[in-house]
Amino acid sequence: MSVVVGSGFSAAPSAAAGAADAAHDAHLALGGAPCDVALVFVGGDLVTEPAEALRVVQEILDPTELVGTTAGGLIAGEQEHEQGDGVAVWAISLGDEGRAEVFELHTTEIEDGIALSGIPAVELGATSAVILLADTAHLPLEATLNAFAEHLPGVPVIGGVPSLVPPDGRPLLRGLGQSTAAGLGIRFEGIEVLPLVSQGARPIGPELTVTAGEGAVIRELAGRPAIDVLRDTVDSLNEDDREQIRHGLLLGLVVNPGQPDYGPGDFIVRGLAGADPESGAVVVGAPVTVGQVARLHVRDPQTATTDLDDELALRRTATGSARVAGALAFTCNGRGSDMFGHANHDAEAIQAGLGPLPLVGMISAGEIGPVGGRPFAHGFTATLAVFLA
């Protein structure tokens, strides 16, 4: 038996009614296959009723593992419900060879910082992918993703940060109630999962080498003060690129050096967080190393559309003769109608590129996905976990 995915969504006025409608649709799509994992996303005003949604989903799907989160917006099918109340359910049957392990991440304050516990200790190569729901009010996300890179090297980690937290401050859900964990993860093995990260940005101008810097501070690029080099680079751009930079100056940093050429998927894109005109240093939202290649990037609706379409086409090619069983999506709350001028942009693109397929996810306050084989936190990004049958 192969992997089967079912999904459902309902905008019913109560969490119980919405969960019932969504879970019934997911149950029908499974076609009698057992539910190994169910993911529940509870949105809008219904975030105060998560236990009711979980109870109903448990009754209808009887999943081996039940996890979820509250969210400010939901993705289901071809639609993105940016503001409305609703419940979305995603259910997977892993077939004869697949397996899933749900784990909790916890943090403890220690003398010199915060200790993280809960990352699974498994053999290298045993994990297909990890889905991660991160409560960043309690989880240091960058340090956590660095720990994943160390303990599960090369494993795609895809997920998001809840964009709406209930009044009690606990957005994560497990079993029949709220979880006190700082992060909830699902580790899959024995199946094939393709990650997708669309940062919605494209490189412009020349490649520049970091020649002095530490932490998140770049002091020199190509042997000159960084701010002077960036100013000269902007001045050398054509009029269209200079116009797009007015939306915000972004810098891409190569994750894996030593390649003959670098394309959009090789850079982790970050905004410039500050500058010191006196010293010529600039601050970026990521650690830098001397010798690292950097390049200016721009982000705009057309670039974001093209980037997502290109990434989807690559995943379609990568599936070969395999069938796509379903997908989980995590998109930024800065995308959607705010970026593109209309709703459903990303969901429609995913369905056009890979569908029709069972698609569920959440509009996030931060997205998680791999670049250059390492997990990163993102903004203004669409991340996707594509499950093959």
Regions from the language model: what does each represent?
Residues 1-51, 56-59, 63-65, 69-340, ...:
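Small-residue-enriched flexible segments
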